[in-house]
């Protein structure tokens, strides 16, 4: 402690203490689990939404609406979904109960806690990510698709053989942004679970 009158050099003692702490390895595993889940869901949904926008509509109003969740702070988004998914008064659980399904404590269940936190963050960021992918798709010249169609290529094949290879630089950037943001997750955990239940959501930032 440099603020103490008698500072004591501890060397690597703190790192040695971490190496012996089982919570450290738990936080490592939880963080990796969250990162993989968040990256997978967000990237797949972003590509799907971008492809649908490219194929069906390019409305400016829709693009603006997709950015709205991203403009909300992490704390507000976490609070909103915490209330919506509440076991007793949450509208989601009330709907599940009305159709004969069992209520689920999404943030308090050991199995559902991490997927639910990942869902909240995917909901907030997927619109922004999809617009980045959509912008990459917009840079592909139309004559490339026209030439492929003349050669007998289907839309599905053109997507995999033309679109995906040409947007790889954009996807690489998206992955960098998503991975960086995933490792920095804190607000959603602090607001909803505080690392529980039984440390199943205790990520690195909350360790």
Predicted regions and their residues:
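A structural signal for multi-pass alpha-helical bundles of membrane permease subunits
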Residues: 1-207
């Amino acid at each position: 402690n440099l603020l103490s009158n008698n500072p004591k050099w501890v060397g690597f003692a703190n790192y040695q203490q971490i190496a012996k702490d089982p919570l450290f390895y738990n936080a490592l595993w939880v963080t990796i689990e969250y990162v993989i889940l968040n990256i997978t869901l967000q990237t797949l949904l972003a590509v799907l939404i971008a492809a649908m926008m490219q194929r069906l509509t390019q409305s400016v109003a829709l693009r603006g609406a997709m950015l709205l969740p991203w403009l909300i702070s992490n704390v507000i988004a976490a609070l909103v979904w915490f209330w919506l998914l509440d076991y007793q008064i949450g509208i989601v659980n009330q709907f599940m109960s009305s159709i004969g399904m069992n209520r689920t404590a999404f943030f308090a269940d050991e199995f559902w806690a991490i997927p639910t936190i990942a869902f909240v963050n995917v909901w907030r960021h997927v619109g922004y990510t999809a617009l980045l992918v959509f912008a990459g798709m917009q840079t592909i010249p139309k004559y490339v698709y026209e030439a492929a169609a003349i050669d007998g290529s289907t839309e599905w094949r053109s997507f995999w053989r033309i679109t995906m290879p040409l947007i790889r630089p954009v996807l690489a950037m998206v992955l960098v942004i998503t991975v960086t943001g995933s490792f920095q997750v804190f607000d959603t955990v602090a607001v909803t679970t505080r690392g529980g239940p039984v440390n199943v959501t205790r990520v690195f930032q909350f360790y």
